[in-house]
Amino acid sequence: MSGESGFKNKSISEIVKEIYENIDGMTMSGKKDGNSNIGGFIATRHKEWYDKASIVNIIYEGYVTYGGMTGRDMGAMAQGLNESMDFEYLKSRCKQVEYLANKLDKYGVPFQRPFGEHALFIDAKKILGHIPIDDLIAQTLAIEIYLEGGVGSVEIGTLLADRDPITQEN
């Protein structure tokens, strides 16, 4: 793994802390590399943003102190976040995605580059171009990957992004 030379002797938690000290706000799903089965969070340093987000949170998720999560789930997410900052864990995750990228390259499967640490985005339209967009190409690919190999994946695009609010087209 490579990185910026100024961070060479810093721990993952020190790097994360420095990144977060320089942001105005963020969202995170604990189900990605937060190693949690549920949950996520919104953080901001702006009281006005917090107040607006709190209203929506209370309506849809629960009170701001727990966001609809049980104490057990909050504890699991906290533990998962700590574990996900372990260098060996992160190196392993990066190697897994790199392994997948190499296999896809070997078989000529098109994907976006550069790929990330926890995900790789396959270009479903290039693989299944004969399927009309309205028939949800990426959903079809995700389902077929699961049926064929038991590998869970998710569509990011046509269905997730929803239709254009004006034209109603994908």
Curated annotation (Swiss-Prot):
GO biological process, one term: amino acid metabolic process
A GO molecular function held by the record: lyase activity
Entry keywords, A to Z: Pyridoxal phosphate
Names of the cofactor(s): pyridoxal 5'-phosphate
Pfam families: Beta_elim_lyase
Superkingdom as given in the UniProt entry: Eukaryota
Modified residues (N6-(pyridoxal phosphate)lysine): K32
InterPro entries the record matches: ArAA_b-elim_lyase/Thr_aldolase (IPR001597), PyrdxlP-dep_Trfase (IPR015424), PyrdxlP-dep_Trfase_small (IPR015422)
Family: Belongs to the beta-eliminating lyase family.
Name of the protein: Putative beta-eliminating lyase-like protein
Organism from which the protein derives: Dictyostelium discoideum
Organism ancestry: Eukaryota, Amoebozoa, Evosea, Eumycetozoa, Dictyostelia
